[in-house]
A protein has these predicted regions:
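Acidic helix N-cap motif at the loop->helix transition within catalytic regions
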Residues: 20, 45-53, 95, 99
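C-terminal subregions of glycosyltransferases and related glycan-biosynthesis enzymes
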Residues: 208, 212-267
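Donor-binding/catalytic cores of nucleotide-activated saccharide
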Residues: 71, 92-202, 209-227, 247
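A conserved acidic beta->alpha catalytic loop
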Residues: 25, 40-50, 67-69
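Short loop->beta transition adjacent to catalytic acidic/histidine clusters or analogous donor-positioning motifs
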Residues: 3-6, 27-38, 46, 58-62
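Short aromatic/hydrophobic "clamp" motif used to bind/position activated sugar donors
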Residues: 87
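Glycine-rich, basic loop-to-helix element that forms the pyrophosphate-binding segment
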Residues: 66-82, 95
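N-proximal low-complexity "stem/linker" segments adjacent to membrane-targeting elements
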Residues: 1-27
Length: 267
């Protein structure tokens, strides 16, 4: 089996307490053909020196230091400087199972799919819970994935970037980027755009990513109702475009509207 280059992107902002563990989990991957992009987003702690220390001992690591501009701009800059056949994203508070990249790449190569979606563990203190929906099996078509997506439209499993493997050629050919004006659901918007241009999707039932619940993060706090409504309203055109492109918009329009309305009901 071939070993294509995988670019692992880590956006970093004031992540010193957990950063070494995150980087070590990437360095110790059993899949070794990696380009590791550590992108410091103007951290005010010792995150940058930690990155520089690891870059001195691992030639696969490239450290990029930028003025603070937000996670979306940081990811976009890394995407534009990545060289891998595939892209993988890791948040600096989290860590990977040692087999994470190997399993993602093996699944991608054996199925020739455009995206691999893996289960993950949510870590809350000493408690770990596995999250995910899809079962391993034949690749899903674009239409199949779109149907599954609306069963759990607000889930991290479909929405985030860090439990997935992406073909970089699709991202580059269609200039897919994170929306730098959004501070919530920017991952989901990126994925909706990617799904528009990808043809096949497969699942990995093994949990390969450990997501550390952070009570100070925007994803762990109660999002302001007005902002949540604004964000979901801005997502609507992308939903409509995706489901129109694949001929499912009229069929799934009620579910899409229900997802938008649920913000007001549950926020």
């Amino acid at each position: 089996m071939s070993t294509p280059l995988v670019s692992i992107v880590v956006p970093i902002y004031n992540a010193a307490p957990n950063l070494a563990g995150c980087i070590q989990s990437i360095r110790k991957q059993r899949y070794e053909n990696l380009e590791i992009l550590l992108v410091n987003d103007g951290s005010e702690d010792v995150s940058l020196p930690i990155c520089d220390m690891y870059a001195r001992i691992d030639p696969r690591i490239t450290v990029i230091n930028r003025p603070n501009s937000g996670v979306s701009a940081t990811r976009n800059y890394a995407i534009e400087h990545a060289h891998g056949d595939y892209l993988q994203f890791v948040d600096s508070d989290d860590w990977l199972d040692r087999n994470a990249t190997r399993l993602l790449v093996e699944r991608a190569l054996e199925t020739d799919c455009d995206m691999v979606i893996a289960r993950y563990c949510r870590v809350d203190g000493e408690k770990q819970t596995v999250h995910g929906f899809l079962s391993e099996g034949p690749c899903l078509s674009q239409r199949d994935l779109a149907r599954h997506l609306l069963e759990e439209p607000a889930s991290f499993y479909y929405g985030v970037m860090w439990n997935k493997l992406y073909r970089r050629s699709i991202i580059e050919n269609h200039h897919i980027r994170c929306n730098e004006e959004m501070t919530w659901s920017e991952d989901f918007l990126f994925n909706l755009e990617y799904i528009r241009y990808a043809n096949s999707f497969c699942a990995l039932e093994t949990p390969i990513y450990y997501y550390r619940k952070n009570n100070k993060s925007i994803t762990a706090t109660k999002v302001n109702l007005l902002n949540a409504v604004k964000v979901k309203t801005s997502l609507f055109p992308y939903y409509k475009q995706l489901y129109t492109d694949i001929g499912l918009y009229e069929q799934f329009k009620p579910q899409i509207y229900r997802y938008l309305v649920s913000t007001a009901e549950h926020s």
